C-alpha cells in the first residue's frame, strides 16, 4: 500500500504523473485498536500495488534515449543482502508476518483496509482488486488470529493460499556506509509493515545516496558526506521506532505486546546513543544535490 505522499514522490522523481493510474484505491481505514476496542473508521488515501507490478511499470518508462557509457564503478551500492564484512544487522524484534491470499466476501468494502489488534498479534487486510486481497497475520498462528477476529469475519469468503513468511520487525545495517560503499533500500533499513512507508523511504534513501556519491565525485570530503548519510538514515530509523512504540503501546496488555515494546525500547536506546555521538549537521539535501550548510 502506497500513501498519497509517496505516490507524489514517485511521480515527481520519475516524471510520470499517471504512474499509479488504474490501481485499487483505499479511501478508508477501519481500525480496531487496542485489543477489545470497537472499530473506528478513518479517512485514508492510498493505492494497493504489488512490488513486481510497480517494478514493471517503472521498467516500461522511457529511458530518455541514447546509449549509456559503462565504466568501472568507483562505488558499491549495497541494496540487498549480503552486507559487507565490515557491517552487520541490528534488529529490534522477532515477530514474523504471514502473507495470506484471500477472496473477499460479496459485501466486503473494496475501498477500505482493516487493522485489528488481538491479545497476541495483529491482522491487516488489504483489498487489491474487486474480489481479492491480502491478509497479513503477525504474532500468533494465523488461523488462530483469524478465528478470534471481531472485525474481519464478514469481509472474507475464503483463504486461497498462505504465502511466504517474512520478518516484520525493524532492522538496520550498521555501519550503513564506509569507504567507497553505502547501503541503501532494503540493504540499509527494514521497517515494521504496520508503521512504515518502506517504498517511500527507499526512494528518499536512493536520492540521498546518489547525491552523496555525486558530491564526493565533485571533490567533497568523503568522511563528512558519509557521516551525513549515516546520520540522516539513522535519524529516520529512530523516528520509525518512535512511531512503532506508539502503536505497540496501544495494541494490548498481554505478554506478547510487552515483549514487542521491550524490543522497541532497546532499539530507541541504541539509536539515541549513536545519535548522541554523531557530528553536527554540515550538509543538507536541496533537490537532488547535497550542499554544504553556510
Where are these regions (language model features)?
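N-terminal glycine-rich phosphate-binding loop and ensuing alpha1 helix
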Residues: 1-9
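A structure-centric signal for secondary-structure junctions around beta-strands
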Residues: 26, 132, 178-179
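C-terminal helical "tail/cap" subdomain of flavin- and related membrane-associated enzymes
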Residues: 214-294
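Conserved N-terminal helical subregion
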Residues: 8-101
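FAD/FMN-dependent oxidoreductases across multiple families
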Residues: 141-227
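Predominantly flavin-linked oxidoreductase catalytic cores and closely associated redox partners
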Residues: 59-161, 165-173, 189
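Tryptophan-centric aromatic hotspots in well-structured domains and transmembrane helices
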Residues: 33, 47, 75, 122-123, ...
Amino acid at each position: 500500500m502506497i500513501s498519497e505522499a509517496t505516490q507524489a514522490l514517485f511521480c515527481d522523481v520519475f516524471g510520470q504523473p499517471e504512474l499509479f493510474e488504474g490501481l485499487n484505491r483505499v479511501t478508508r481505514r477501519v481500525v480496531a485498536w487496542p485489543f477489545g476496542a470497537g472499530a473506528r473508521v478513518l479517512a485514508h488515501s492510498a493505492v494497493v500495488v504489488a512490488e513486481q507490478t510497480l517494478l514493471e511499470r517503472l521498467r516500461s518508462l522511457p529511458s530518455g534515449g541514447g546509449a549509456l557509457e559503462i565504466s568501472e564503478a568507483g562505488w558499491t551500492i549495497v541494496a540487498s543482502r549480503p552486507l559487507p564484512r565490515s557491517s552487520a544487522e541490528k534488529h529490534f524484534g522477532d515477530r514474523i508476518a504471514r502473507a495470506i491470499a484471500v477472496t473477499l466476501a460479496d459485501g466486503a468494502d473494496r475501498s477500505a483496509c482493516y487493522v485489528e489488534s488481538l491479545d497476541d498479534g495483529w491482522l491487516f487486510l488489504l483489498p487489491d482488486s474487486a474480489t481479492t486481497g491480502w491478509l497479513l497475520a503477525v504474532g500468533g498462528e494465523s488461523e488462530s488470529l483469524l478465528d478470534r477476529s471481531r472485525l474481519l469475519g464478514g469481509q472474507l469468503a475464503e483463504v486461497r493460499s498462505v504465502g511466504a513468511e517474512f520478518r516484520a520487525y525493524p532492522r538496520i545495517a550498521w555501519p550503513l556506509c564506509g569507504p567507497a560503499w553505502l547501503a541503501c533500500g532494503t540493504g540499509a533499513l527494514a521497517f515494521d509493515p504496520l508503521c512504515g512507508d518502506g517504498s517511500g523511504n527507499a526512494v528518499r534513501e536512493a536520492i540521498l545516496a546518489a547525491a552523496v556519491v555525486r558530491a564526493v565525485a565533485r571533490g567533497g570530503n568523503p568522511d563528512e558526506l558519509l557521516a551525513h548519510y549515516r546520520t540522516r538514515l539513522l535519524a529516520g530509523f529512530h523516528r520509525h521506532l518512535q512511531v512503532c512504540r506508539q502503536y505497540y503501546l496501544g495494541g494490548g496488555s498481554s505478554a506478547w505486546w510487552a515483549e514487542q515494546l521491550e524490543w522497541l525500547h532497546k532499539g530507541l536506546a541504541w539509536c539515541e546513543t549513536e545519535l548522541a555521538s554523531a557530528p553536527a549537521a554540515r550538509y543538507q539535501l536541496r533537490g537532488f544535490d547535497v550542499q554544504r550548510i553556510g
